[in-house]
């Protein structure tokens, strides 16, 4: 009984993982309703996340609330760096501080 339960859970997780990977290849579908929710979908032709207006019902799983969520799910082997423009902080000796970010792609 325990083995059957463990196997069932494993198969559900495996199926979810396989289905999850196909989300990014689905076409954009704005749904049947007429709401205007700003969403993002992954365009597999251009390999970018693009904005669209979701109607609020139906549609498909290629529908993300943020561009970052879309990118995290669908960009393969790419670094996602979001930067903000800030005024540089000055140290006491009036030298501007600088920051460096290193991203490991492996």
UniProtKB/Swiss-Prot annotation:
Name the InterPro entries on file: Kunitz_BPTI, Kunitz_BPTI_sf, Prtase_inh_Kunz-CS, TFPI/VKTCI-like
The main place the protein resides is secreted
Q: Where is the signal peptide?
A: 1-19
Write out the entry's keywords from A to Z. Blood coagulation cascade inhibiting toxin, Disulfide bond, Hemostasis impairing toxin, Protease inhibitor, Secreted, Serine protease inhibitor, Signal, Toxin
Matching Pfam families: Kunitz_BPTI (PF00014)
Among PROSITE patterns, the record links this protein to: BPTI_KUNITZ_1, BPTI_KUNITZ_2
Q: Name one GO molecular function term.
A: serine-type endopeptidase inhibitor activity
User: Cellular location of this protein?
Assistant: Secreted
Where are the disulfide bridges?
24-74, 33-57, 49-70
Q: Where does the record place Basic residues bias? A: 84-93
Domain of life according to the entry: Eukaryota
Transmembrane annotation, as ranges = none
Organs and tissues of expression: Female salivary gland (at protein level).
Q: Which Gene3D superfamilies match?
A: Pancreatic trypsin inhibitor Kunitz domain
- State any GO CC term: extracellular space
- BPTI/Kunitz inhibitor domain location is 24-74
Q: Where is this site: Reactive bond for host factor Xa (F10)?
A: 34-35
Member of which family? Belongs to the venom Kunitz-type family.
**Complex and partners:** Monomer. Interacts with mouse, bovine and human coagulation factor X (F10) (activated). Interacts with human coagulation factor XI (F11) (activated). Interacts with human coagulation factor IX (F9) (activated). Interacts with host plasmin (PLG). Interacts with host kallikrein.
Q: Please explain the role this protein plays, according to its UniProt record.
A: Salivary anticoagulant that targets host coagulation factor Xa (F10). Blocks activity of host prothrombinase (F10-F5). Inhibits factor Xa-mediated acute inflammation in the host. Inhibits other host proteases involved in blood coagulation and inflammation: cathepsin G (CTSG), kallikrein, trypsin, alpha-chymotrypsin, beta-tryptase, plasmin (PLG), elastase, proteinase 3 (PRTN3) and coagulation factor XIa (F11). Inhibits lipopolysaccharide-induced procoagulant effect in human endothelial cells. Inhibits Xa-mediated cleavage of protease-activated receptor 2 (PAR-2/F2RL1) in the host.
Protein's UniProt name: Guianensin
């Amino acid at each position: 009984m325990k083995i059957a339960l463990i196997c069932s859970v494993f198969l559900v997780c495996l199926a979810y993982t396989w289905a999850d990977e196909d989300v990014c290849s689905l076409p954009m579908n704005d749904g049947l309703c007429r709401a205007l929710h700003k969403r993002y979908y992954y365009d597999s032709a251009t390999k970018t996340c693009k904005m669209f207006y979701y109607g609020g019902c139906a549609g498909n799983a290629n529908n993300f609330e943020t561009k970052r969520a879309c990118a995290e799910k669908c960009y393969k082997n790419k670094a996602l760096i979001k930067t903000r423009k800030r005024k540089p902080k000055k140290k006491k000796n009036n030298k501007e501080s600088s920051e460096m970010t290193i991203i490991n792609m492996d």
